[in-house]
Amino acid sequence: MMNAVDKYSTDIIADNEMIIAVDDVVKKDYDSAVVRIKKALARLKSTGHVEKYAEYLNILGLVYEIENDESKAFECYLESLATAEIIRSRDLKAMVYSNISSSYSKMGRDKEAQRYFNDARDEYDSSSEKSEECHKSWVMFDYINHAINDRYVALS
């Protein structure tokens, strides 16, 4: 069993992996980003930091989406959503619903996109978790979503 210092150190290393992964996304080095996020996920799993694990899994889904691997993206989103349900994190559910909505929209499946957008809005509106940590997560998701949108515009 990990002591508090080891757990804290492992969480910090996972956070640093994620920061570098986001930088890799900006540089369009998606393979490196996937590797780094998977390393961060393995570290978080070992510490039992479930909520952050689910947040990072959601981000991995975004990176897969950038790479046009919708199947892997949805696997990540659905596992993240299931975890959010278990830990009762409305803010995390809102983020995942938003990403699923965006995916469906890009596929031209507007009815599903609208449903998940409404779910995201409802979850976020009723969330009591509007903390600084949640805000930082939203900023990171927004940043990567812009990268996805920029890529789709460039491909059009």
Model-derived regions, located:
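Amphipathic alpha-helical segments of tetratricopeptide repeats
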Residues: 2-3, 39-43, 79-85, 89, ...
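Residue signature of alpha-solenoid helical repeat architecture, marking inter-repeat boundaries
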Residues: 8-12, 51, 91, 132
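Residue register of alpha-helical TPR repeats
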Residues: 15, 55, 95, 134-140
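Eukaryotic all-alpha helical interaction scaffolds
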Residues: 24, 44, 64, 84, ...
